[in-house]
Amino acid sequence: MQRDEERPIDFGMSLELPKTPNDVNYVKKLITQILYLQTLVSEQQKKIESSTLEVQKKKDQIRELERIYEMNPKSFLTLRRTPALKLLPETLSVELSNEVNLTSSTTSSCVKPSPYLTNCNLKNKDTFPVSKNNCSLSSGIFTNSNGTNNCFSTHPKSLDDAKDNVVPKKLNDTDQFPLWSKNETIDPIDLGYSFISPFSMSFASKGNEILDPGESTNKNLFYEFPNGTTEPFEKNSVHSGKETLQYSATISKWKAMIEQIIFQNDQAASLSLQQQLKNEDIEDNINLINTILPFSVTLMKNKFGNFLIQKCFEYSTEAQLQSFSYFLKKHVKELSIDAFGSHVLQKSLEIYPERFTNNLIEELIECLPATLMQRHSCHVWQKFFETRRKSLVDGIFDHFNKKMQGKWLQVSVSEMGSLVVQTIFENCKEKDKRTCLDEIINNMDQIICGQWGNWVIQHIIEHGSEPDKQRILNSLLKEVESYSTNRYASKVVERALRVCHVTFFDRYVKEITTPQNELPTIFLQEIASNQYGNYIVQYLLQVATPSQINLMAEHLKKHMVSLRGHKYGQRIAALVEKSKS
């Protein structure tokens, strides 16, 4: 039987209009039709936008699962031997490992092993819970005891999707479990949320890392942390009965809010979770932070999620801080160059105890010198130098200087690198910054003429030690004309005249008013007529001693005609005339 053809939507186009254009009713109906069509278009656009977001969201989830599956399909096969259920009694775990009923299934299951199931030998079998009808879930099908099949519309993505259909199976129905007393049952609800939702908890423990192709499937599924443990964070509290249902609903609500932050940049959701962390219920805080942990790296790089992670640092236990520290270390480079992730790293340097930041700084050093010159990561380095962690700085600066040897010139002439260099000058010990200072002063001729490097030289002149100042001032006098007429170097010369008035001012005036190589021309004339140097001469004529002003005025009078006719010399000519009176 053929299907009836679907009637096309006419969007009101079938509305018959009078043929007389001058009819008032014609105009009214035309306006009505236009408004009707506009309303339809507006509603359709809203639906399309909403559908597009949902479709994109689902596509992202599918792509992530496909990527994980392609990397190692074996890690998606369910577990068969020695499940090692941490929440079960030891005797129960042993019996389950020997007497697990497996149903036939395809190998394409998307249920990821629970983090509480480790050291597994995988076969091409899937294990699912028992349904209310005493059925086993396999590939989306209930197989009843009478042989009939009841199909699921979709394969459950995790045990969460099927937990409403799960009931306790009486273990006294068979003779396979002699140690259990009669009429005893296992209720998954009593085992806690971690057992009910292995898919989500596996990501909480394993993060985004999947076993590489070729790795043994017997590999422990936990991260191994620097302290030698395999627990990434504290387990959520185990509840039972109705409390667990309420607890599961709370976890689901938190996850939904995290999803809103990640996919929709929802500021309100971020603020709401931050507010919940401020309550006095320590248990709720631990559970909330444990729920956030699996998504921590993604949230760190999110516009509003990064504030949530920073707030988590303030309320985390030591174990949770260590978990965050592990993720920070693993992704330190990508976080440091991210606009929002860099803020999280800066916060960690402020709030973390020193034992947590050792490895973090070591990883940052391996990314040198690129991270010193990047727009966002440079602020992480500035925060590190400003924290003045004595135990860290003493041991790390040797490694830091060795890594940066021969690269300070490149860093000093960059916009962000020059800021980091000045921060080092302000906050580090003399022995730690000596390598940097020597390399910069030795390459001063290239740095001083740079748009950003000139600020580094000015900083040394203003705040450096006396020997370093003298080395720079001597270099300025050797190339006095060149530096005084350069766009950026002239700023350094002016800064030296203002800061080192006693030691440098007289030497500079003498240098620019003394004829060179027995020629009548002097540097003062060239500097006064230069578009950048004329500001230096103006400053000299205003603050010099009377004898120095008279000396410079006598030299400049000889060139008054050219000064008055020059765009940049008119102001100097006026000052010379003023000095006469």
Curated annotation (Swiss-Prot):
One MF term in the entry's GO annotations: mRNA 3'-UTR binding
UniProt domain PUM-HD: residue ranges: 225-580
Cleaved signal peptide residues: none
This protein's record includes keyword ATP-binding: no
Pumilio repeats mapped onto the chain: 291-326, 327-362, 363-398, 403-438, 439-474, 475-510, 518-554, 555-581
UniProt KW keywords: Meiosis, Repeat, RNA-binding
Keyword Flavoprotein belongs to the record: no
Superkingdom per UniProt: Eukaryota
One GO CC term, this protein: cytoplasm
InterPro entries assigned: ARM-like, ARM-type_fold, PUM-HD, Pumilio_RNA-bd, Pumilio_RNA-bd_rpt
SUPFAM superfamilies documented for this protein: ARM repeat (SSF48371)
PROSITE patterns, A to Z: PUM, PUM_HD
Protein's GO biological process: meiotic cell cycle; nuclear-transcribed mRNA catabolic process, deadenylation-dependent decay; post-transcriptional regulation of gene expression
Residues annotated as transmembrane: none
Role, per record: RNA-binding protein essential for meiotic progression.
Protein name from the UniProt record: Meiotic PUF family protein 1
Species this protein is from: Schizosaccharomyces pombe (strain 972 / ATCC 24843) (Fission yeast)
Gene designation: mpf1
